Regions:
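C-terminal regulatory/interaction module of P-loop NTP-utilizing enzymes
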Residues: 1-289
Length: 289
């Protein structure tokens, strides 16, 4: 199936790149190609990279581009299949039993079923995007379950029977690579590593998201963030922090601050650990430039 047959208007990597830019997401050619190929091949897309490089935002921008529903499953330590699939609304079931005059009441009717993200994805009747965010935070058991789910796109609820997807969503998984994912899951996906953007690309991102920022300011902020990322920080600043720092510094400059002072006084937008601030304080002027 050609991509355009299902994802109208996205018939090439360039189409993907241009469409994402309309959603204010500046994607590299390599990322746009990975998205295009995952769509063309009907495979999930696995995005790995450091926190803050734009993995989740890529999924959000793509759903906006496709004008489709975004279903997000946020993974965390201890998540299990029941949490991701469904649960029964026990309080409502009990209340219904107390109030029912009909002996034929079925407490396992769909009205008592609380659909969690994966079941919501199975119920899609039109195009959708399933985002499985930070899969590396889940354990290997949940990862194995997820692999099976992505293979069949169906589940069996003992009280309701088998439920199969009538419209498979496009799937994006993200990982911060805090642990290695199982090779079987990787094989099922189109893989792409998102690195921090090049300075020129990051400047374009800042200008697209913060309309009040001048190009010279964006370039200075991006250069400073690049120096920060080269330091052994507890948390390196992501792209979102770059945009916010440029915006914040510009607002202070508009209130009469000098540029060096505006950069310094807004540093809390980009550095959010006291240890990092203390470590860099003696060299802050050098960092800011």
């Amino acid at each position: 199936m050609k991509v355009g047959a299902r994802y109208k208007g996205l018939g090439s990597p360039q189409d993907v790149q241009e469409a994402l830019s309309q959603a204010l997401y500046i994607a590299s050619k390599d990322l746009a190609t990975a998205i295009y190929l995952a769509m063309a091949l009907g495979k999930p897309l696995l995005l790995e990279g450091a926190p803050g490089v734009g993995k989740t935002e890529a999924a959000k921008a793509l759903s906006s581009t496709l004008s489709c529903e975004l279903i997000r499953l946020q993974c965390y330590e201890g998540i299990d299949a029941n949490t991701a699939l469904y649960e029964w609304n026990f309080p409502r079931q009990i209340l219904a039993m107390r109030q029912a005059n009909d002996a034929k009441l079925n407490i396992y009717d769909p009205e008592f079923l609380i659909a969690r993200p994966l079941l919501q994805a199975l119920h899609l009747q039109s195009e959708g995007l399933l985002l499985i965010d930070e899969i590396d935070r889940a354990d290997h058991e949940f990862e194995a379950f997820l692999l099976e789910f992505l293979s069949d796109f169906q589940i069996t609820i003992p009280e309701r029977g088998r439920i199969r997807a009538s419209q498979r969503p496009f799937v994006i998984l993200t990982s911060n690579r805090t642990r290695d994912l199982h090779e079987a899951l990787r094989r099922r996906c189109v893989y792409h590593w998102i690195d921090y953007p090049s300075p020129s690309l990051e400047v374009d991102i800042v200008l697209s998201r913060a309309s009040n920022v001048a190009r010279a300011t964006a370039e200075a902020i991006v250069a400073a963030v690049g120096r920060l990322r080269a330091e052994p920080l507890a948390k390196a600043p992501g792209v979102a922090e770059t945009v916010e720092w440029a915006d914040a510094a510009t607002r202070l400059k508009d209130l009469g601050e000098t540029w060096p002072e505006a950069f310094r006084r807004s540093i809390g937008v980009v550095l959010k650990e006291q240890d990092d601030l203390s470590f860099l304080e003696p060299r802050m002027r050098e960092i800011i430039g």
